[in-house]
Amino acid sequence: INTLILGRNHGTVMIAEESTAWPKVTGKVEEDGLNFSYKWNMGWMHDCLDYMKLDPYFRKNNHNKMTFAMSYNESEKYILVLSHDEVVHLKCSMLNKMPGLEGDKFKNLMAGYAFMMGHCGKKLLFMGQEFAQKQEWSEERELDWYLLENPEHKKIQNWVKELLHLYRRN
């Protein structure tokens, strides 16, 4: 089905949200692959979030959480996703996952986004993450756009914009 859809619809992207180590998800059908455009890198997402949630004092023995995904990066065409699944059902917003005082949270989030943009793979942020939405996401309300009146939230939005420009240029 992926071959059919990708062949008929120029510009279409098929992404597999796959959490096992199933091989060749992005491989060609002729090579026993499933022919998805990208595979969601669930391992990177969980490891990165686990690391970013740690108080910096405790990170020194956990750097492997930030580097492990590089050991298997060439096995598939990955997309790095920070999805809605991570900001619902009492899991906190991205900003509120970060340790420390409010100023520390913003700096941590900026560092996390910079790491994501520098890591191999395509990128995908869920809505509201680009300006550090404070509340968990809910389909029952709109995003807190008023937060962009706050300089810290505007700074995050501009940071993400600059990171995306840098990413697209390289």
Language-model segments: residues:
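Catalytic cores of secreted or luminal carbohydrate-active enzymes
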Residues: P151-N170
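Conserved alpha/beta catalytic core and glycan-binding cleft of carbohydrate-active enzymes
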Residues: I1-E140, L147, H165-R168
